[in-house]
Amino acid sequence: MATPSPLPSFAAIVVAAGKGLRAGQPVPKQFATWRGKPVLRHSVESLRAAGADPIVVAIPDHAGDVAAKALDGITEVVFVTGGQTRQDSVRAALERLSSVPPERVLIHDAARAILPTPVIERVLHGLDESGGAIPVLPVVDSLAVAAGERMADKADRESLRRVQTPQGFRFSDILAAHRAWTGATDAGDDAQVLMAHGGDIALVEGDEALKKLTFAEDFMADLLPVRVGTGFDVHKLEAGEELWLGGIRLEHDKGLAGHSDADVALHAIVDALLGAIGKGDIGDHFPPSDPQWKGAASSAFIEHAAKLVDEAGYRVGNIDLTIICEAPRIGPHRDAMGQRIAELLATSPDAISVKATTTEKLGFTGRGEGIAAQAAATVVRKDTPA
């Protein structure tokens, strides 16, 4: 069995300066979390493990802090501010490397998060006899040449390939090509720039895993279809307090005491929703030490939790709430509570179950000293049919 030849030394450029708006993430997609860590970190770790040194990352203006956080702990990484176009960003990174020029450089799109080591190896070895090497895959679908909304001609897919990154180059060749580029529009990729400069490009086998993360659906596909969280809360009953429970006010001789309106039912639901998406608990988001939440309506807390669920790529599946008390009687108010909770979560009342029980006169709830509530919540990936 032949022993693979060692990889030659190389530098790498990771292009991460785009806005990434189509991905529908709260931050540019290269900094969004995917499979447990920022998209950018995936490919940088792969390049670093393969021996890339240094790695120059082109980032948006004023994104230094978020980029540094995304790559915390990874050594030999240099940041440069990207330009208006991808080509401008690559040029800036190449110029940064030019002071100590490497012999070979790989240029990779950060949005291609999964970067298999065999692809890196094939691209680098493809430079043994060419000024450039790019990973490609065959075209599997039939193709048509369009003229407006009509088919004008067929296209021969046998001679076409899908192009991926990382694209590898002899550094001096690609730097000279970028400096000489006079195209009227931005180049489609760096191989196009080198070809315009008379360079030779080798084609090597790509990998389907190098899919580019582009749309919101690409991020959702990585999410679990359903996640579950639970919550529990207790508040003391005191005279002179209003009793808010399940988002509605009840008439009773005592009310629940707390920093906010002390609605244990909504608090339990908030904790269940936050737990389902791994966002801590109600105290993390609304600390009782913060005076702005003094006497606050718990409806604000549950709406905040629902917003975080949405931002995480999920929608509320269902809520199962149990209120534990001797008094007041919950039965007459269950439907109103369910309706109000559904309104706050922008979901159907059918998705909300409100139940009540007692502890048979045992414990603090049995003695009428307080009310407890527990909740279970499911959140469902937003692209799942309702």
Curated annotation (Swiss-Prot):
Functional note: Bifunctional enzyme that catalyzes the formation of 4-diphosphocytidyl-2-C-methyl-D-erythritol from CTP and 2-C-methyl-D-erythritol 4-phosphate (MEP) (IspD), and catalyzes the conversion of 4-diphosphocytidyl-2-C-methyl-D-erythritol 2-phosphate (CDP-ME2P) to 2-C-methyl-D-erythritol 2,4-cyclodiphosphate (ME-CPP) with a corresponding release of cytidine 5-monophosphate (CMP) (IspF).
Any one of the GO BP annotations: terpenoid biosynthetic process
InterPro entries membership: IspD, IspD/F, IspD/TarI, ISPD_synthase_CS, MECDP_synthase, MECDP_synthase_CS, MECDP_synthase_sf, Nucleotide-diphossugar_trans
Region ranges (2-C-methyl-D-erythritol 2,4-cyclodiphosphate synthase): 227-386
Cofactor(s) it depends on: a divalent metal cation
Binding locations of 4-CDP-2-C-methyl-D-erythritol 2-phosphate: 233-235, 259-260, 281-283, 357-360, 364, 367
Key word Metal-binding present: yes
Ranges that cross the membrane: none
One Pfam family hit: YgbB
Source organism: Erythrobacter litoralis (strain HTCC2594)
Molecular function per GO: 2-C-methyl-D-erythritol 2,4-cyclodiphosphate synthase activity; 2-C-methyl-D-erythritol 4-phosphate cytidylyltransferase activity; metal ion binding
Record-listed E.C. numbers: 2.7.7.60, 4.6.1.12
Annotated binding of a divalent metal cation, by residue: 233, 235, 267
Annotated spans, 2-C-methyl-D-erythritol 4-phosphate cytidylyltransferase: 1-226
Key words, A-Z: Isoprene biosynthesis, Lyase, Metal-binding, Multifunctional enzyme, Nucleotidyltransferase, Transferase
Stated name of the protein: Bifunctional enzyme IspD/IspF
Gene3D superfamilies referenced in this protein's UniProt entry, alphabetically: 2-C-methyl-D-erythritol 2,4-cyclodiphosphate synthase, Spore Coat Polysaccharide Biosynthesis Protein SpsA, Chain A
CDD domains, sorted: CDP-ME_synthetase, MECDP_synthase
HAMAP family documented for this protein: IspDF, IspF
Pathway entry: Isoprenoid biosynthesis; isopentenyl diphosphate biosynthesis via DXP pathway; isopentenyl diphosphate from 1-deoxy-D-xylulose 5-phosphate: step 2/6; Isoprenoid biosynthesis; isopentenyl diphosphate biosynthesis via DXP pathway; isopentenyl diphosphate from 1-deoxy-D-xylulose 5-phosphate: step 4/6
Reaction(s) the record says it catalyses: 2-C-methyl-D-erythritol 4-phosphate + CTP + H(+) = 4-CDP-2-C-methyl-D-erythritol + diphosphate; 4-CDP-2-C-methyl-D-erythritol 2-phosphate = 2-C-methyl-D-erythritol 2,4-cyclic diphosphate + CMP
Similarity comment: In the N-terminal section; belongs to the IspD/TarI cytidylyltransferase family. IspD subfamily.
Site (Positions MEP for the nucleophilic attack): 157, 212
Chain positions of site Transition state stabilizer: 22, 29, 259, 358
